[in-house]
Regions:
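Catalytic cores of nucleotide-sugar-dependent glycosyltransferases that transfer UDP/GDP/TDP-activated
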Residues: 1-299
Length: 299
């Protein structure tokens, strides 16, 4: 539809008047040319965002894992073998239902070998909850393992997220999902059961897997942040950071970055056929790709 009433669209559409245009991802550069004929003769510079690259020792990684495993036992009652995270904004383009699809397949596979996993989704649609409210929710009903509608707990997009997560947890025994609707990670932000001294850096260092299978993402810094501590980072093929990874590794295989392609079809389809796909057909495509991602993660 018409987006001319949105200030951001209006500004971008006039960017051809600037002395230079920079795009943070390959797809974004292509989209700029798609905006209009004014961009046909403009050179658009590809300038990827930066990714944190602090050195992480094995001791730091093991310490982070130990703290997150202890915390999981405190709130869920078991010690997970596989630690997964997704730190993001609570918007639909982040594709968080795909996380649950992959976890559904992992649950079945873990049931066969006795392993257990946990996924921590750290996102907030209601700002930062203060320590007093955090302690109250933790004591009253075990937040963030459980939730209630209404501030200081679930508000806005967090409500729909929990509507997906709650039935998932009820139906799965080997992978559970924790929705931490908060900014930051420490005892005053997440609760007294967080091990003393644990920070967001420890959460990053602990992750075996970081999800970021967005439906649209100009770049995507967050999905690659745990890469330096050894996590497998799962992104989608529309994420601009995928082009960044390809340039860094010079086209060589990168075992720690797994690219999900949710446009992968089991047979060639024409444009009209794709446009007229039913919801059931689209869901089947997503399910098949999520199963492939789960299989790749366990290779």
């Amino acid at each position: 539809g018409d987006l001319s009433h949105l200030f951001r669209h209006a500004l971008i559409s006039k960017s051809h008047c600037c002395d230079a245009i920079m795009a943070v991802g390959d797809h974004t550069a292509e989209e700029m040319h798609f905006l209009g004929r004014h961009f046909d003769h403009h050179r658009i510079e590809l300038v990827y965002n930066g990714v944190p690259a602090e050195p992480v020792t094995l001791d730091q990684r093991n310490a982070g894992r130990a703290m997150l495993i202890d915390y999981t036992e405190a709130i869920l009652g078991y010690r997970p073998d596989v630690l997964m995270t997704h730190i993001t904004r609570p918007v639909i383009s982040k594709g968080m239902w795909r996380d649950l699809q992959v976890c559904d397949d992992l649950d079945k596979r873990f049931a066969q070998d006795g392993r257990k996993g946990v996924l921590y989704i750290l996102t907030s649609g209601g700002g930062t909850r203060n320590p007093r409210d955090v302690r109250s929710m933790e004591q009253e009903y075990g937040w963030p393992a459980d939730h209630r509608a209404g501030y200081p707990d679930l508000v806005g997009p967090e409500v729909d997220l929990w509507r997906m997560i709650e039935p998932f947890n009820a139906d799965h025994d080997h992978v559970k999902v924790v929705l931490a609707n908060q900014f930051g990670w420490s005892a005053d932000r997440i609760g007294r059961r967080v091990p003393e001294g644990m920070t967001i850096a420890d959460l990053r260092n602990a992750a075996d897997v970081e999800f970021g299978m967005a439906t649209y993402e100009p770049f995507g810094i967050s999905p690659l942040e745990p890469l330096g501590s050894g996590a497998v980072c799962v992104i989608s093929n529309v994420c601009g950071c995928g082009g960044f990874v390809e340039q860094v590794v010079d086209g060589k295989p990168c075992d720690n970055v797994l690219v999900a392609d949710y446009t992968r079809l089991d047979r060639p389809m024409g444009l009209d056929e794709v446009v007229n796909m039913t919801a059931a057909q689209r869901d089947a495509v997503e399910r098949a790709e999520s199963a492939r991602v789960a299989e790749e993660l366990l290779r």
